[in-house]
Amino acid sequence: MKRYFVTGTDTDCGKTFVTNQLVNYFSDSAAIKPIASGCEYSENQLVNSDALLHQQQNHLPMEIVNPWRFRLPVSPHLSAREDGASIDVHKVADYCLNLQVNDIKKLFIEGAGGLMVPLNEQDTWLDFLKLTRIPVILVVGMKLGCINHTLLSQEVLEINKIKCQGWIANCLDQDMLMLDENISTLEAKLNYPLLARTNYGGKISDICLSSL
């Protein structure tokens, strides 16, 4: 089974939406969100709204889709601490590397926030990637400032020799000035391909998804 880690340039760049679109596109795929904060109680269990979308799409138990759940809508290390817990990055890595789902050939693993979001006092998602070496799909929320955020993300990945499979332009605002020019700038400056584009909450537009 191929595994991909879906991360983003920042919070609210559209990782969950894009991940759902990828699962819709690939009929032999599923998605999980191993760590989520901002969970609320529903039917006597903590539920994260993003993870719930994956669970409803995959028809998998929530315990498989989202095993690490915390209440406060803050960085995972802070939310876990407030719940009297801590996140062991090695356990998260083992879980994501060893999870098997029947008839699934592609597993999309959605992170929380960006690459440098802390999971505990020492480790970030980058440390998770160093342990797992799972290829990255970078979701770029197309808005003012995205070029800077995207190039910084590329630098972090390259310095740490983490493979990036490609990036997806998630067009958040149909009125964004010079949207196509911004995408062209990123295509010229990034060292990995533009896989797809999503337009204002619409379906994913295939550009190079066959490489996955």
Swiss-Prot record:
EC class of this enzyme? Answer: ligase
Q: Name one GO biological process term.
A: biotin biosynthetic process
Q: Which GO terms describe its molecular function?
A: ATP binding; dethiobiotin synthase activity; magnesium ion binding
Q: Where does ATP bind?
A: D12, C13, G14, K15, T16, F17, D50, E110, G111, A112, G113, N170, C171
- Name the source's superkingdom: Bacteria
CDD domains listed in its UniProt record: DTBS (cd03109)
Q: Name one GO cellular component term.
A: cytosol
Tell me the protein's name: ATP-dependent dethiobiotin synthetase BioD
The taxonomic lineage of its organism, from the top, reads: Bacteria, Pseudomonadati, Pseudomonadota, Gammaproteobacteria, Legionellales
